[in-house]
Regions:
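NAD(P)H dinucleotide-binding glycine-rich loop of Rossmann-like/cofactor-binding domains
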Residues: 45, 58-64, 75-139
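Short amphipathic alpha-helix with an adjacent loop that forms part of the alpha/beta core around
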Residues: 186-196
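Mid-domain Rossmann-like dinucleotide-binding core that forms the NAD(H)/NADP(H) cofactor-binding site
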Residues: 108-184
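Short SAM/SAH-binding signature in class I
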Residues: 199-203, 222
Length: 315
């Protein structure tokens, strides 16, 4: 089979298209013919061995996929690695059936990103009806879904942050009340002005200056969920400031969600059901051939993409 493999850690240039032996299923496993693989920021960290979990070489990147079983069933799955390939051997118990009305592109966009968007709002932020929400990277795979889910949950004012006019127009189309330039100076002041005061919930995945600016916008009992560090700049949280302002900073790593099957099942049922009913729109930013994995990573890290990026192992 064809696969993307890295034999030494590095950036996009470390990924090579290689020919490997087909995987053989172990006890309780099946081999899935992959039709789509998702591209995530976590993959770009993994190829550099900068992710939260240490990686081992040789490595086939990729943590999510959609495909068909030998019986022809359409299924989706999340794995520690190995999805940038034509085939993968996985436990049958971990596969999720894809409902009618959801195509392969949509299904991949609803796995990591759909679960994350749903969980950071419901499980981490405990969003209540009428509360204001700020979504950073609101035109991205997770952010674009979070804007819509927040609106469906009855949020008050929803403000999306994005880096270009095109992306901000998309954020408004998805239901945000306002869309601000995430790259302009004075982000915290502009968020407070757009909301008419401090905010209740912030969803943040950039780190660095954006983290500090957005944390300063939280109202008393406001919650900021940090679910990524795209800038690779970690922040220091001052506990005295949290106490003084009655603010909460909550971390989210999907690995811990995946260890809770009941939460995964409920989350996927919600997002897949909403998509099948036409109530949740997935934004696909591009479908690359397997040989284009490096280009997909460059687009993601360079913030030159909108929505979810996918790989098509068959092309």
């Amino acid at each position: 089979m064809k696969a993307i493999q890295i034999t030494e850690f590095g950036g996009p240039e470390a990924m090579e298209l290689v020919e490997l032996e087909d995987p053989q299923p172990g006890p309780g496993e099946t081999v899935v013919e992959i039709t789509r693989s998702g591209v995530n920021f976590a993959d770009t960290h993994a190829t550099r061995n900068e992710y939260l979990a240490a990686q081992e070489l040789p490595l086939i990147p990729g943590v999510e996929f959609v495909g068909r079983t030998p019986e022809g069933k359409r299924v989706a799955g999340v794995v520690p690695s190995g999805a940038y390939a034509e085939r993968i051997a996985v436990p049958v118990a971990g596969l999720v059936p894809i409902p009618d009305g959801v195509d392969d592109d949509q299904a991949v966009a609803l796995l990591i990103q759909g679960l994350t968007a749903d969980a950071i709002l419901r499980v981490s932020a405990h969003l209540a009806v009428g509360e204001s929400v700020v979504v950073n990277a609101a035109a991205g795979g997770t952010g674009s879904l979070a804007v819509q889910i927040a609106r469906a949950m009855g949020a008050g004012r929803v403000i999306g942050l994005a880096s270009s006019d095109e992306k901000r127009s998309l954020v408004l189309e998805l239901g945000a009340d306002d869309a601000l330039d995430s790259a302009a100076t004075g982000l915290g002041d502009r968020v407070r002005e757009a909301n008419g005061g401090e905010v209740d919930v912030v969803l943040e995945m950039a780190g660095g200056d954006a983290f500090d600016e957005l944390a300063s916008t939280l109202a008393p009992f406001g919650r900021m969920v940090t679910f990524g560090i795209a800038t690779r700049q970690e922040n220091t949280v001052r506990t005295g400031s949290l106490m003084k302002h009655s603010r909460a900073i909550v971390g989210f790593w999907i690995t811990h969600l995946l260890a809770r099957p009941e939460l995964v099942r409920a989350g996927l049922e919600r997002v897949m059901g909403a998509a099948a009913a036409g109530e949740l729109r997935t934004v696909i930013g591009g479908v690359y051939p397997l040989s284009g994995a490096a280009q997909a990573h460059q687009a993601l890290v360079g913030r030159n993409s909108t929505g979810k990026l996918l790989l098509d192992p068959s092309s």
